[in-house]
């Protein structure tokens, strides 16, 4: 795969992922707000004001998640995003960090 094709596939995967997360947040029972600026998605838990931030890192073709518990770097491994340090897939990681920050179970229902 050429570098341009690889970049296009990476950017498409990021866009699809962020849209899926936004849709899941819209349908979640937990009171959360989100704001997106280009490829940075900031999720704010309304009960306590804490945030989880997802950002595109094009130079290394990763998706980074910043949470209270730390920073996580995810690479796209078909069929989805995998964290290089915990081995978790993105849905599991997001549910975990959101639950930790909320102090109660959060499930976005992502696949």
Model-derived regions, located:
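N-terminal intrinsically disordered, cationic/polar leader segments
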Residues: 2-53, 57-111
């Amino acid at each position: 795969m050429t570098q341009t094709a690889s970049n296009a596939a990476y950017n498409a995967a990021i866009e699809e992922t962020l849209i899926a997360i936004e849709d899941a947040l819209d349908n979640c029972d937990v009171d959360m707000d989100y704001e997106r600026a280009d490829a940075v998605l900031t999720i704010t838990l309304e009960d306590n004001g804490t945030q989880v931030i997802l950002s595109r890192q094009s130079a290394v073709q990763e998706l980074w998640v910043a949470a209270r518990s730390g920073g996580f770097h995810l690479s796209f491994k078909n069929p989805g995003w995998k964290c290089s340090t915990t081995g978790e897939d993105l849905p599991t990681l997001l549910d975990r960090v959101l639950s930790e920050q909320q102090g109660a179970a959060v499930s976005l229902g992502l696949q």
